């Protein structure tokens, strides 16, 4: 009996350790009224990296900003939103062409969800074999959905040539995607498709346009620190001098 109990104890410990190492594949965190940050995960350079997206619950349905990086979480995100809010997703935006933003566009299009990117993002998606949206924006655009107004803004090249941000003026929520890095980050991340020379100028334009945001959402780091934009500018300035 003692050996049996010991075996069960070892099995329980191993199961617990495995569960802890894997962790949740989808995490949803409230930001403010009707605003939620969802996080999925993928592996980059042998390290598990979080990818933050956002969704907003409106009277007309739910709007998603960036799709899950983990391709197994396209449907679980929809299911979680339905279960939590009793709402369906009606629109999905991708803020640049990389797969951590666009991977779910085709899946969501097939589900009847309206998908959006800029023309520039669509060009780069087509060129690089990334998923593409149905509706294309050729300039900064203001949307009003279910009582919420938000706008897309292209401040210039940085992380990629096409990166845009989303701004909610009433709530002062700035969704920066991969353009803005976390306040604790030590570098600007992957720059293989970026523009190092213009990165700092792009971030400064963004800072000048949207003053005093109450929330700044970044793609791959902690989004609770409002120093993220200032810190990103400092890193971009240093990199631009090298």
Protein language model features and the residues they cover:
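Bacterial Sec-dependent N-terminal signal peptides
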Residues: 1-22
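Conserved beta-strand hairpin/beta-sheet module of binuclear metal-dependent hydrolase folds
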Residues: 30-79, 165-178
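Structural recognition of the beta-strand scaffold that forms the well-ordered cores
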Residues: 37-39, 55, 63-65, 90-94, ...
């Amino acid at each position: 009996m003692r050996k049996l109990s010991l075996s069960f104890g070892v099995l329980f410990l191993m199961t617990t350790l495995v569960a802890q190492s894997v962790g949740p594949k989808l995490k949803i965190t409230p930001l403010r009224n009707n605003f939620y940050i969802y996080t999925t995960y993928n592996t980059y350079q042998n390290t598990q990296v979080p990818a933050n997206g956002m969704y907003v619950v409106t009277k007309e349905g739910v709007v998603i900003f960036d799709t899950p990086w983990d391709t197994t979480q396209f449907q679980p995100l929809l299911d979680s939103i339905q279960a939590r809010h009793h709402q369906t997703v009606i629109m999905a935006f991708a803020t640049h062409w990389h797969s951590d933003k666009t991977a779910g566009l085709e899946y969501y299009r097939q589900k009847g969800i309206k998908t959006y990117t800029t023309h520039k993002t669509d060009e780069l998606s087509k060129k690089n074999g990334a998923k593409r949206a149905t509706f294309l924006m050729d300039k900064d655009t203001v949307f009003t959905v279910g009582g919420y107004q938000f706008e897309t803004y292209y401040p210039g090249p940085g992380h990629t040539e096409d990166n845009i941000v989303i701004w909610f003026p009433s709530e002062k929520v700035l969704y920066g995607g991969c353009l803005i890095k976390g306040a604790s980050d030590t570098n600007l991340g992957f720059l293989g498709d970026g523009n190092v020379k213009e990165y700092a100028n792009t971030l400064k334009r963004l800072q000048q346009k949207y003053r005093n945001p109450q929330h700044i959402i970044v793609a791959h780091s902690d989004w609770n620190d409002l120093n993220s934009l200032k810190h990103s500018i400092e890193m971009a300035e240093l990199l631009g001098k090298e």
